[in-house]
């Protein structure tokens, strides 16, 4: 059962397993053009697959006001509003899951006090994006090996996400980098009818995300060792 709530920013969040002691906030990708936000097919598939097995975890899918990488601060404000929502509802810790452009959004708001860890799914991590907000957190990146640069999508590829991951690691951020063999860009797309169409290898996206979620549920990220 999902419930849609308005966020303070004007965006929306779709909640599953409300009132959990822990929370997962899922943020979507975007486009070059400023278009109204939509619900992410990949986030929806992951929520459908994982939420029943984690009844004590609230899943909050975010629909931006406008989804475009040319207005990242707006998308980040929407993600922060969702973090504030689950925090106010009593979530003790939050896992951010960002798909595509949502990877940049998640890293950009990772310093929020409720965030414990970030999972980037085929994430866009541009070289100009600061990653210092991840210090003291955890970053797990999952990327499809067959994901490549596409027209209009700036720098979404395993090579670029690995470079972003390595920048975070250089700051002492813990985490993992996983390539899904023959994996594409995410786990699902949406048909014109509105139904989900899983992409080849979608089960691998679910299972790798499940592992990250299990780790999150088991306990907070360890503090980095003193330099």
How should each PLM-predicted stretch be described?
Residues 2-54:
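Short, surface-exposed "cap/lid" segments of acyl-processing enzymes
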Residues 38-49, 146-175:
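Active-site-adjacent alpha-helix of alpha/beta-hydrolase-fold enzymes
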Residues 47-68:
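Conserved alpha/beta-hydrolase
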Residues 69-89:
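Alpha/beta-hydrolase active-site loop
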Residues 97-106:
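Gly/Ala-rich beta-loop-alpha elbow adjacent to hydrolase catalytic centers
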Residues 114-125:
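A conserved short beta-strand
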Residues 135, 140-147:
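Short beta-strand/loop motif that positions the catalytic acidic residue
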Residues 171-227:
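C-terminal catalytic histidine-bearing segment of alpha/beta-hydrolase fold enzymes
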